[in-house]
Regions:
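Membrane-proximal helix-turn-helix segments that form the acceptor-binding/catalytic region
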Residues: 27, 95-102, 123-124, 148-167
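Nucleotide-sugar-dependent
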Residues: 18-22, 279-284, 291-314, 321-331
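Carbohydrate-associated surface elements
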Residues: 170-173, 188-200
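Conserved donor-binding/catalytic core segment of Leloir-type glycosyltransferases
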Residues: 210-229, 236, 366
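Nucleotide-activated donor-binding/catalytic signature segment of Leloir-type glycosyltransferases, i.e.
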Residues: 258-285
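A charged, aromatic-enriched C-terminal amphipathic alpha-helix characteristic of glycosyltransferases
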Residues: 352-381
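Glycosyltransferase donor-sugar binding loop
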Residues: 246-259
């Protein structure tokens, strides 16, 4: 008799229904096709839940399959002001997860962590083993702005690294720079929902009406429009050099600082249209003449492995990007440009491309799909 795959309790960093899914949601949804998953969303307080129309008892309406279970833990507000409240919230979180695990009859699950801040969950849930998924250089993120915050993150990450049976790292360079090598460490770069974004190539997929109204040619971006990641100055300067091109940014503005609206992007040919439902994104990307990854180059982004690269390529769209190390492996399928003048020139040049590289883009995306990546990860889990 084949042994049933071990259940997973995932301490997630994003809500499962977040309109801009990351590898956290993509990975767990696909693992739930083969094994049971308890997806523990970031804790919130009851006031937030009532305002958002969520069930204040900690349940959620998201139920993607019989194997995917979602818990929205409830904690007390003001933890950032009080160490006592923060400690109490940690106990509340553990208690709620334990209760749900008992209800689901999870026995010795895999504990899957996505942040060093989750170190306090280790050894509290009766887990058989810990899997740690490193997606970023966490100490370089906006939430670690002070030396004390960075020091805590480093210490917490050491705790997680020591406990983890498997460490999955999305950036090869991050693994090399941090010396994360050996049998426990697995470089698993980000990939894309190729089938979903490949829908942009199908004749029956119609361009979204608001994109058709903007008109082309369109240089487009999908993702969080935030100053810590997007080089607004470069984008604005490139847009001023190309008044004939519509620059369209699709996604929430100001994730790190929601009050931030980039004034430098208030240009007649720049359109910030806000987030759109994930299911409808192929109809938006279909309107792109060129796709953009205009990231700042800094301590955080130099280790980024953008999912959007393969999302764009799956739609057959040419890509212009700043010089992120992870993008260099795509070769001539991505045009690298590091200053406003060369970025504007690169976008114009991509507009003149014929479809000679389209199939190569699609083929590269197909080699970097979630279906392939899940096979790799499942093989690692089954060997242990």
């Amino acid at each position: 008799m084949t042994e049933r795959p071990r259940d997973i309790v995932c301490i997630a960093t994003r809500r499962l229904d977040n309109p801009m899914p990351t590898n956290v949601q993509h990975l767990m949804l696909r693992l739930a096709e083969r094994r049971r998953v308890l997806y523990v969303e970031p804790p919130v307080d009851p006031v937030f839940l009532v305002r958002r129309g969520r069930d204040p008892r900690g349940e959620t309406a998201v139920q993607t399959s019989s194997r995917m279970h979602v818990l929205s833990p409830i904690v007390l507000p003001w933890a950032h002001r009080s160490k006592a409240i923060a400690a109490l919230n940690q106990r509340l979180l553990v208690a709620q997860v334990r209760r749900r695990l008992r209800r689901l009859a999870f026995e010795r699950p895999l504990l899957w962590l996505f942040s060093p801040r989750q170190a306090g969950m280790i050894g509290r849930l009766g887990e058989a083993a810990v899997c740690y998924h490193i997606t970023d250089d966490y100490k370089a993120m906006p939430g670690a702005a002070t030396a004390a915050a960075r020091s805590r993150l480093v210490a917490d990450e050491q705790t997680v690294l020591q406990a983890a049976r498997h460490v999955f790292i999305t950036s090869r360079r991050l693994a090399e720079d941090r010396g994360l090598s050996g049998e426990r460490f697995h470089v698993i770069p980000n990939v894309a929902d190729v089938d979903h974004f490949g829908a942009a190539l199908r004749p029956e997929t119609r361009v979204a009406e608001e994109m058709a109204a903007i008109g082309g040619p369109i240089a487009g971006f999908v993702g969080a429009v935030d100053d810590y990641k997007i080089d607004f100055e470069l984008l604005a300067a490139a847009a001023r050099r190309t008044p004939e091109i519509s620059w369209v940014l699709i996604g929430p503005v100001g994730w790190a600082d929601p009050t931030t609206v980039p004034p430098q992007l208030r240009l007649p040919n720049v359109h910030l249209i806000g987030p759109r439902p994930y299911r409808s994104l192929p109809a938006y990307v279909k309107a792109f003449s060129v796709a953009l990854i205009p990231y700042r180059i800094n301590e955080y982004t130099r280790y980024c492995s953008p999912l959007k690269l393969y999302e764009y390529l799956a739609a057959g769209v040419g890509v212009v990007a700043t010089d992120l190390p992870a993008l260099r492996e795509a070769g001539d399928l991505v045009t690298i440009a590091s200053d406003p003048e060369s970025f504007a020139v690169a976008v114009r040049t991509r507009l003149e491309d014929d479809d000679g590289l389209r199939q190569a883009r699609i083929d590269l995306a197909a080699r970097n799909s979630w279906s392939r990546r899940i096979e790799e990860i499942e093989a690692i889990l089954c060997e242990s």
